[in-house]
Every structure is written in structure tokens, then in C-alpha cells.
From Swiss-Prot:
Identification of the protein by name: ATP synthase subunit beta, chloroplastic
Alphabetic keyword roster: ATP synthesis, ATP-binding, CF(1), Chloroplast, Hydrogen ion transport, Ion transport, Membrane, Nucleotide-binding, Plastid, Thylakoid, Translocase, Transport
GO MF annotation: an example: ATP binding
E.C. no: 7.1.2.2
Membrane topology note: Peripheral membrane protein
Length: 498
């Protein structure tokens, strides 16, 4: 699908053709604006309020038209704080939706929802902008090739492999490691695949956004000396922003990614942290606009809003967008409408478990709950499929036996079940892995494990060749050779203690 980029500045289109209205009502981030008869702006048009407040501070607020109320009134949602706005202030209809800068000049820079740089590195050197509201690519333009996207993370590559050009969801409650996993994926993909990434920070912590930026500079993903050599563009609309900005920042990031796909014909990675906050912002805006709430207080348009965003994240014959989205699960309830609606759009789901995080097994990916449409023998091959199924069977049997172990103890199990439990505990620990982005916390260097190495390691555990090794030897290591070396070191340490 080709974009027709314009060549005006970012944020708002040229303001020459002035269609002027004035503010009639302000309720928090929502403005009612009156326009002259016959000059009503279209839905999604950007409106700009410029002027000075009561203490002569400059005001420049951009809003987006959401409703036409009748009587020449429109209702718009502000993209920044509405402090200092007053009734009667002049409002300019720009005659077009919000437009943001696109292209190579966006790499290495941080933007807000309007496409304005917020990193104090001066203006963006691009004349090309693109509107954030566009239709999804036509069905005939979509690409249908199936191939695996290797991440270097054992548990993901083996049990819930990602599809190149697919959509992946990271599900988890608060504090189980979604953001760390996303940061590791950005790091691994930038190093191993050398692709261009766009990161959309939607309604998450500003501190984490800052940490991510600093880490990217340290690791070279963002090149400070030569900013054009950078591999990622960052778009932030964090927790402190009004709901309008949080609702639209995902579209800003997606618009930048679409340009790399359609015009530059590149394979792009789009990270969204957190897609739940996109839904949450939509819910806030929906309530402010006076719509009747739906199930659990969510907006009645939940499925439509999610579909509009997700249908644009796709692969065409020009290039691909592989999207990795963190999904916060409220109160760890996967049946909540927000995560449940997201599930429908995904090719793979990586579910993070509080139980595993409590055991200290990181990444805390639940091997039985995580799924992928790619885990089929005709796609991944017989060896990979068989190994993954046997790993899942072993872990499932261990899960079934846990109640018996808790009540009666290990000694009451049959010989076969005891062996299954021992291997399952080794597998559980071998699914952990030291991360590059967590080196500061763990003290151990990060590891990238190729898919072939991962399969070899799990086949060895399942075959029983490593039954004699202690289970702690498999904890936080890379490939299986490191586990055997760690077992030898542990044995030597024990002998020295004796």
C-alpha cells in the first residue's frame, strides 16, 4: 500500500486557509467549539488553539474532532494539557488530520503524539509528513508467507515461536517483566537482524521510557555521533499525558512504521508498550464524550478501536511489520475485555506468570499458557515440533502431580513419575536465561541462544543423558554446554567444601 506523503511541517498542516471557530465549553481535556454555519470541520480534523493565558504564557494546544453535535458545534479532545484555555478563545481548523514526520530522519529521535521532537536535539530534518489516520492495506496487497522470527530467547523460540510479519502479545500482570522482555527483544533484534524498529510508549512510566533511551544509546542502537545510523525511532505518550495523547500515540508510531514498510520497502519492528493503555485511554475519552459504557466499564466501541489499529499492523508485498505488543492484564484476569479483545488479533501469545516470577525464573514465560499459530510441523519442522510437544507434556505431567507431591511428598510417586518430575524441574530451570538488558541486576552476562542450540539442549534433557546433573546447573544459563560446565563447577565446589 503506497502512502501519499505531504511536504508540510509535522503536527499540523499549513494554517493559511483559516477556518476560525471559538471555544464554547471546556470540560477537562474535552472542548466544545462553535464554527460558522457551513464551515464545520470533518471528524478527526486537527484543531489548533493559539493565544496567551491570563499570565501571558503562550498557549498552543492541538485537538482532534471526535463528534459533530449539531448547532454548528463540534466536540474535540485535546492532545496536551488544557491549562489556561478560556471560553471565547479562537480555534483554527487545519482542514486535515494530525500529520507526523516520517522517513529516515525520524531514526534516533524521540517524538510526542504530534510528531514534535522532545529530545532537545533540534528540529527533524524531513519535509515528508503523513496523516495518522489511514485505511488498512487492501486484502489483495497482503503477504501470506510463513516464516519463523528467531529471537534468541529459548522459551519463546521453542514453545511459542514468533512469525515474521506477525503480531505477538506479551501478557502479564504488574511487575512480572513485560517491559524487560520487550527491551531484550529490541536489543536482540537490532543486533541479530539489523532491522529498523519503531517503539511506541503508550501510557507507561516516563522513567522506563528514559531508561530505554539511555540503554539504547549505550548499546549503540541509537548512535549519538551519527544519528542517521540509529536503528530505532521512539514515540512516547506516557502516563502523565491527557487521554487524547495516549489514545493516538500508537497511531503516530504505526504511521512511522508504515512509511518504512511501504515507501522504503523495509522489514520493520513495531513495539507497543502497552496496548492495554491504548484501550484505557479510549475508555476515558469515551466517558468524556458521554457514551454509554459497555462490559466492565469499557467503551462500547472497544472492538472497533482495537481492530482499526491492529488491521494496519500487517505485512504487504512491499515489506513487513512485525509487531510485539505488551498487554497489561488487569488483576491477572485474562478474561477481562481488554486482553480478551487483543487475543483475537495475535499470531502468538507470550503469557508471563507470577508463579514463575516468584520462583525467580526469568523470563517468567508460562510454557503451557503461551501459544503460537506457527508451532506446526509443516512450518517449524518435525524435530522442533516433537521436542516442543514433549517438553509441554513433561511440564503438564509435573503440574498434575504437584498436588500429590504437596500432600504426600515425592517418595509416594512411582519411579517413572519421579523421573518425570526431575526432568520437568530441569526443563523449568533451563527455560530461564540471562538477559543482556538485565546484566546490571543479575551480574551475569546476557546470552543469545540460536534455535538449533535450543532444540539440542531440550532433546538432551528429555533423552535422560543429563539426569545425573543437579537441577541448579540449568538455572540462568545460555546453551546446554554451559549447564554441563556449571554442573562440573558445582561438583568441584562441593568437593572443596568437604
Amino acid at each position: 500500500m503506497r502512502i501519499n506523503p505531504t511536504t508540510s511541517g509535522p503536527g499540523v498542516s499549513a494554517l493559511e486557509k483559516k477556518n476560525l471557530g471559538h471555544i464554547a465549553q471546556i470540560i477537562g481535556p474535552v472542548l466544545d467549539v462553535v464554527f460558522p454555519p457551513g464551515k464545520m470541520p470533518n471528524i478527526y480534523n486537527a484543531l489548533v488553539v493559539k493565544g496567551r493565558d491570563t499570565v501571558s504564557q503562550q498557549i498552543n494546544v492541538t485537538c482532534e474532532v471526535q463528534q459533530l453535535l449539531g448547532n454548528n458545534r463540534v466536540r474535540a479532545v485535546a492532545m496536551s494539557a488544557t491549562d489556561g484555555l478560556m471560553r471565547g478563545m479562537e480555534v483554527i481548523d487545519t482542514g486535515a488530520p494530525l500529520s507526523v514526520p516520517v522517513g529516515g530522519a525520524t531514526l534516533g529521535r524521540i517524538f510526542n503524539v504530534l510528531g514534535e521532537p522532545v529530545d532537545d536535539l533540534g528540529p527533524v530534518d524531513t519535509g515528508t509528513t503523513s496523516p495518522i489516520h489511514r485505511s488498512a492495506p487492501a486484502f489483495i496487497q497482503l503477504d501470506t508467507k510463513l516464516s519463523i522470527f528467531e529471537t534468541g530467547i529459548k522459551v519463546v523460540d521453542l514453545l511459542a515461536p514468533y512469525r515474521r510479519g506477525g503480531k505477538i502479545g506479551l501478557f502479564g500482570g504488574a511487575g512480572v517483566g513485560k517491559t524487560v522482555l520487550i527491551m531484550e527483544l529490541i536489543n536482540n533484534i537490532a543486533k541479530a537482524h539489523g532491522g529498523v524498529s519503531v517503539f511506541g510508549g503508550v501510557g507507561e512510566r516516563t522513567r522506563e521510557g528514559n531508561d530505554l533511551y539511555m540503554e539504547m544509546k549505550e548499546s549503540g542502537v541509537i548512535n549519538e555521533e551519527n544519528i542517521a545510523e540509529s536503528k530505532v525511532a521512539l514515540v512516547y505518550g506516557q502516563m502523565n499525558e491527557p487521554p487524547g495523547a495516549r489514545m493516538r500515540v500508537g497511531l503516530t508510531a504505526l504511521t512511522m512504521a508504515e512509511y518504512f514498510r511501504d515507501v522504503n520497502e523495509q522489514d520493520v519492528l513495531l513495539f507497543i508498550d502497552n496496548i492495554f493503555r491504548f484501550v484505557q485511554a479510549g475508555s476515558e475519552v469515551s466517558a468524556l464524550l458521554g457514551r454509554m459504557p459497555s462490559a466492565v466499564g469499557y467503551q462500547p466501541t472497544l472492538s472497533t478501536e482495537m481492530g482499526t489499529l491492529q488491521e494496519r499492523i500487517t505485512s504487504t508485498k512491499e515489506g513487513s511489520i512485525t509487531s510485539i505488543q505488551a498487554v497489561y492484564v488487569p488483576a491477572d484476569d485474562l478474561t477481562d475485555p481488554a486482553p480478551a479483545t487483543t487475543f483475537a488479533h495475535l499470531d502468538a501469545t507470550t503469557v508471563l506468570s507470577r508463579g514463575l516470577a516468584a520462583k525467580g525464573i526469568y523470563p517468567a514465560v508460562d510454557p503451557l499458557d503461551s501459544t503460537s499459530t506457527m508451532l506446526q510441523p509443516q512450518i517449524v519442522g518435525e524435530e522442533h515440533y516433537e521436542t516442543a510437544q514433549r517438553v509441554k507434556q513433561t511440564l503438564q505431567r509435573y503440574k498434575e502431580l504437584q498436588d500429590i507431591i504437596a500432600i504426600l511428598g515425592l517418595d509416594e510417586l512411582s519411579e517413572e513419575d519421579r523421573l518425570t518430575v526431575a526432568r520437568a524441574r530441569k526443563i523449568e530451570r533451563f527455560l530461564s536465561q540471562p538477559f543482556f538488558v538485565a546484566e546490571v541486576f543479575t551480574g551475569s552476562p546476557g546470552k543469545y541462544v540460536g534455535l538449533a542450540e535450543t532444540i539440542r539442549g531440550f532433546k538432551l534433557i528429555l533423552s535422560g543423558e543429563l539426569d545425573s546433573l543437579p537441577e541448579q546447573a540449568f538455572y540462568l544459563v545460555g546453551n546446554i554446554d554451559e549447564a554441563t560446565a556449571k554442573a562440573t563447577n558445582l561438583e568441584m565446589e562441593n568437593n572443596l567444601k568437604k
